[in-house]
Design a protein with these regions (language model features):
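Extended, well-ordered protein cores
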Residues: 2-299, 306-333, 337, 344-413
Length: 413
């Protein structure tokens, strides 16, 4: 591959590429040049009002935490992570951060939509959880059992490559209580995703090896080296994940021998190089990036420029804009079709979602007298767009499903 093509391809592994290329699809929507979606900007205020109301209801103090996996460990007035990690209190802040990153990575990878019929009965608390919260608590219980540790119950709160490679769908099904009456979307693909993570950790030694161990948590040591004047740029977290874990995604795309991950194609994005038409989203990688910020901050990192990361192109955020009629589908028969996540329609939907989240963030800050420091996009997603999308979905559809039918394998959405 020519050097220019290599550079252009690697540039796709940045948050700037996500934002720029999604904007190009949005510009086509502004001139009504998209094949599947129409932009109804006159209805945009409805989405803004929904999110403002959601933030006020969820966080009346105005102090909104980041949208991250850690929120799903906080339920019913309890912090399940703090309860599970009490044995780590004697460890250094560095080792605590490694353990948190271990958990965040595997839990995010297991977080794609569970489906409407699955739930997790947590025997320890006596509580039952579904969807993202259920997947979070189930993954935490599996983590603290030592199933991901090569040292087993002797040192359970860690994730090692060899244990990930040994994980089977049967183990996952048992721990996640999957049965014919409690089906989980994409069970086998979730197990394969963790198997692939184990393989990738061993390949990417420069990022994930430390003292003879291969752990997601060793990303902490890699990011230590990326600090400049005591601060870490948020984009460095995403770039490290994309470059280090690019081979994990089974649905990910490649350009020659470079894994470019969660991307689609659209004719509105024009380039005179090998990346012509490519639209990157990196949804799970950015969700993972948001979920690593707090462990890094707790370990003493100063993380700058959070808003370089983009909003997440997933079905709750995207559903908010369809259900608020900010965007509409030109052909209503598309609501009856099950759509592949790489389909042109879904690519348009996801690209519009990224840009509309940026525009919504501007309006939220304007109306709450905040700025990108006091109300970063990560907090607006939490406050926020994701829960507003889920709320309106339940108001409009009995099972809270997204407005579009999706062929989810449990690896992206």
């Amino acid at each position: 591959m020519r050097q220019n093509d290599v550079s252009a391809t690697l540039a796709l592994l940045t948050p700037e590429a996500v934002r720029q290329r999604c904007h190009e699809v949005f510009e086509a929507a502004e001139s009504n040049a998209l094949n599947f979606f129409q932009l109804n900007i006159e209805n945009f205020d409805s989405a803004v009002e929904l999110v403002l109301a959601e933030i006020a209801a969820n966080y009346p103090s105005g102090e909104v935490p980041f949208h991250s996996r850690w929120r799903h460990f906080e339920n019913c007035g309890r912090n399940f992570w703090h309860e599970a990690s009490s044995s780590l209190l004697k460890e250094s802040k560095d080792e605590i951060a490694r353990a948190q990153i271990d958990l965040a990575v595997i839990s995010v990878l297991l977080d794609a939509g569970a489906g409407p019929d699955w739930s997790f009965n947590d025997a320890r608390s006596g509580l039952t959880f579904s969807r993202s919260e259920g997947l979070a608590i189930a993954s935490l219980r599996l983590f603290e059992s030592g199933a991901f540790s090569q040292r087993g119950s002797d040192d359970p709160l860690r994730v090692d490559a060899s244990s990930l490679q040994a994980l089977t769908p049967k183990i996952l099904a048992s721990e996640f209580q999957v049965s014919p009456s409690n089906p989980l979307f994409g069970l086998e693909d979730r197990a394969k995703l963790l198997n692939r993570l184990g393989e990738t950790l061993k390949k990417q030694k420069n990022i994930f090896e430390a003292e003879g161990t291969f752990r997601p948590g060793n990303l902490y040591d890699h990011l230590l080296q990326k600090q400049h004047n005591g601060a870490l740029e948020a984009r460095e977290i995403l770039i490290a994940i994309l470059q280090g874990m690019g081979e994990v995604w089974p649905d990910g795309c490649w350009i020659n021998d470079i894994a470019i991950g969660d991307t689609g194609h659209h004719q509105a994005v024009k380039r005179c190089d090998i990346t012509d038409g490519v639209v990157p989203f990196h949804k799970l990688s950015q969700w993972m990036s948001y979920s690593l910020i707090e462990p890094l901050q707790e370990a003493g990192f100063k993380v700058n420029n959070l808003d370089v990361l983009t909003g997440l192109a997933e079905y709750r955020n995207g559903g908010l804009f369809i259900d608020s009629k900010t965007i509409s589908i030109k052909d209503s028969t598309q609501f009856e079709i099950v759509h592949d996540l790489k389909s042109p329609l879904v690519v348009e939907w996801r690209a519009l979602t990224v840009v509309l989240l940026d525009k919504l963030a501007e309006q939220i800050r304007l109306q709450t007298n905040t700025n990108s420091e006091s109300m970063p996009l990560a907090s607006i997603l939490q406050g926020g767009t994701w829960s507003a999308g889920r709320r309106i979905a339940h108001e409009l559809r009995a099972n809270g499903s997204p407005p579009l039918k999706l062929n989810s394998r449990g690896t992206i959405f």
